[in-house]
Amino acid sequence: MKLRKPYKKIPRAERMRIIEMACKQVSRGVFFSTVIIITSFLPVFLLTGQEGKLFHPLAFTKTFILVVDAILVVTLAPVLISFFMRGRFRPESANPVNRFLEKVYEPVIRACVKWRKTTIGIMLIALAASVPMVMSLGREFMPPLDEGSILFMPVTLPDVSNSEVKRILQVQDKILASEPEVKSVLGKAGRANTATDNSPISMIETIVMLKPRSEWRKGVTKDSIINELNSKLQIPGVTNGWTQPIINRINMLSTGIRTDVGVKVYGQNLDSIYEFSQVIKRDLEGIPGVKDLYVEPITGGKYIDVNINREEIARYNLSIDDVNAVIETALGGARITTTVEGRQRFSVNARFGQDYRNNLPALKNLQVQTQGFGPVPLDALAGIKITEGPPMINSENALLRGTVLFNVRGRDLGGTVQEAQQKLNASIGKMPKGFFIDWSGEYENLIRGEKTLKLIMPFVLVIIFIAMYFAFDSAREALLSLISLPFALIGGAFIIYFWGVNLSVAVAVGFIALFGLAVETNIVMIIYLNDAMQQLVAKKGNSRETITKDDLREYTINGAAKRLRPKIMTVSVSLFALVPILWSSGVGSDVMKPIVLPMVGGVITSAIYVLLVTPLIFLMNKEYELKKFGKIEVTEVKP
């Protein structure tokens, strides 16, 4: 018996005809799968706030790249194929990779077709098992981004003196710098030299720059560094707070809260607001995940109260303005001259020194000059005493406001706040008339992001269904492709559960990107299954008298098993591009991994579904058509 040559040279005319036919067969599906990936990612543009600013560049980049890709698929790719695919060709069966894949895959798909209920049951069980996994995951707005630094924000009592704050700052900086992983420390107390910083002198901000991780002690993490420093920095009268410089500034600008979560207490009376704030603080203590708990001071500020005695000043022929002018000059200062340095002018002010301004006996002995009676001590003209009052009055929407602040560490943000809300509702119950509380900080962003995603997800599914309908000109096959999406979620749910990742906007963006990838693989499979049905109809006609169930089964298996390499290649390209990100490190990898994880897991499970279940569902659909309509619906591949 004479063996057939493994290589065959095809004439140019026939080669161009084959290339044209192959491009018509595949390009439509590839084009629409690319369009589906583009359109499924468009709802990311609906994200607002921080999440929008973070993911819009990603959406723009991906959209522009895929738009160019979709154009090249139907224009440049066929031309390049005609140039490079020439000479002698090997049949598909001569490729050892194809033979190996078909040898492994064909018995498996035959078993799946034979044991239909078992195959579908296993997939449904896996889908059902993923639901409680997703429900048990924690919730957070965005994955914590490691900035490579720490912002230490302790607060002390409102009436603290400048000298005491300076001493505390020096002690804290010395302790912080003693940590082996700390590179440098820079701290400040009070506000910066700008009109937009309203920080009181009791607020300290210290930026702690860390060394590269390669220089850290073995087994040390950033959380362990914070815990170790926090235990060393327990100073009486000082409440510690730990965050990061960039996220702290973002939170303060967007929500007005310098911690992860803030409970805003609104009311009409500062004393009542402070009492409610203390009750809330006591209820929040002990909740797992609540750290750096602190009530923003509403009382405790020290004021010098000067009550002028009108009868006494009248006896000395003085007016209230005369006495106020002396007090203002002594405490606030008065301009005595102006100095000129080059092109700049500076006013020179004079007032009492710090020690005298804070010294009540010295203020009482302040001499007020009179006409005809000589200097008179201020104590003889007014009652002087130190009283307490609010160090700062905060208002929002025309209501007085107090705030209970805390950070979340060692637990997800959503679960921590949810438990805190339940505890407060049970403890406080209904607030008195004129008082109410509101949750703010990063939790506010979490709620906004979840509301937006609840609108986006159904929108994504509708867009994908419409795009697939135009790809196949069949609502039934579009729905058949859409069924693959829940099974793609299985892998995403499993991998984020075992990786220990919380649900966030980044994870949701990863699932949105996964939808397009899963549908792309499914479209490639359905193209070849429809091609097998066309061959069956061309050979035996389209009637129940000429087509049997065995014919449908064999041609479906043949369509699924043949040309297995491009189907595997579609999945492999995605995995080869995504998997290296899981082992990436450095700034930014903390945000990228939650995006990539659901895509990696989903691509794997969707590939299993497409290879094993899609042919089975396709076969069952064709058997139903043959039984009910007497023929099968064949989707022709259009140019």
List the model feature ranges, each with a label.
Residues 19-26, 93-143, 183, 232-236, ...:
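Signature of alpha-helical transmembrane segments and their immediate interfacial
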